Curated annotation (Swiss-Prot):
Pfam family, one: ER_lumen_recept
Bilayer disposition of the protein: Multi-pass membrane protein
This protein's domain notes: Binds the C-terminal sequence motif K-D-E-L in a hydrophilic cavity between the transmembrane domains. This triggers a conformation change that exposes a Lys-rich patch on the cytosolic surface of the protein. This patch mediates recycling from the Golgi to the endoplasmic reticulum, probably via COPI vesicles.
Key words, A-Z: Cytoplasmic vesicle, Endoplasmic reticulum, ER-Golgi transport, Golgi apparatus, Membrane, Protein transport, Receptor, Transmembrane, Transmembrane helix, Transport
Name the UniProt record assigns to this protein: ER lumen protein-retaining receptor 2
Residues covered by region (Interaction with the K-D-E-L motif on target proteins): 47-48, 159-169
Length: 212
């Protein structure tokens, strides 16, 4: 494992912890898209089914279990424990417009036409667009809490670091996964506008807002 993969994993973990702490400490999920969190839970569930079929390392298994557990914990907090604070009126992105095309694409473009491989491919494609409901929600409300922007920043940083990880692996290991790279590029592009606003506003103590 190279330093970019490790820091990417740590950034991803930081994003998840920030979100959970934000919801738990404020006793509110206001400003958080439950639909994005449902999509992320679906991503981790379909990606890590290999937990039942293979073992790579203790680190690998531990991280997979943490991602799955945290994603469902987040969904539970949003839709059950703090349901009264969930802003469903603004969380209106039509997720079927993401899930259905991604499902079709995973059947058409994959490494191997087997159930686990198709589900893994589905998870890669879906993760690249799973943040769209959250960004759409911010654009509808016109702003985001600072702690929410920190969550989004670390989530975007994780994906950007993974892109560097793939470049590193290509040059030093000869490894190249076109599906993962293309999906990662798409996901990073979706964060570009947010990164700009984060640097120019949030880091200067201003509130973040996206163009409506």
């Amino acid at each position: 494992m190279n330093i970019f993969r490790l820091t990417g994993d740590l950034s991803h973990l930081a994003a998840i912890v920030i979100l959970l702490l934000k919801i738990w400490k404020t006793r509110s999920c206001a400003g958080i898209s439950g639909k994005s969190q449902l999509l992320f839970a679906l991503v981790f569930t379909t990606r890590y089914l290999d937990l039942f079929t293979s073992f790579i390392s203790l680190y690998n298994t531990s991280m997979k279990l943490i991602y799955i557990a945290c994603s469902y914990a987040t969904v539970y907090l949003i839709y059950m424990k703090f349901k009264a604070t969930y802003d469903g009126n603004h969380d209106t992105f039509r997720v079927e417009f993401l899930v259905v095309p991604v499902g079709g694409l995973s059947f058409l473009v994959n490494h191997d036409f087997s159930p686990l491989e198709i589900l893994w491919t589905f998870s890669i494609y879906l993760e690249s667009v799973a943040i769209l409901p959250q960004l759409f929600m911010i654009s509808k409300t016109g702003e985001a809490e600072t702690i929410t922007t920190h969550y989004l920043f670390f989530l975007g940083l994780y994906r950007a670091l993974y892109l560097v990880n793939w470049i590193w692996r290509f040059y030093f290991e000869g490894f190249f996964d076109l599906i993962a790279v293309v999906a990662g590029v798409v996901q990073t592009i979706l964060y570009c506008d947010f990164f700009y606003l984060y640097i120019t506003k949030v880091l200067k103590g201003k509130k973040l807002s996206l163009p409506a």
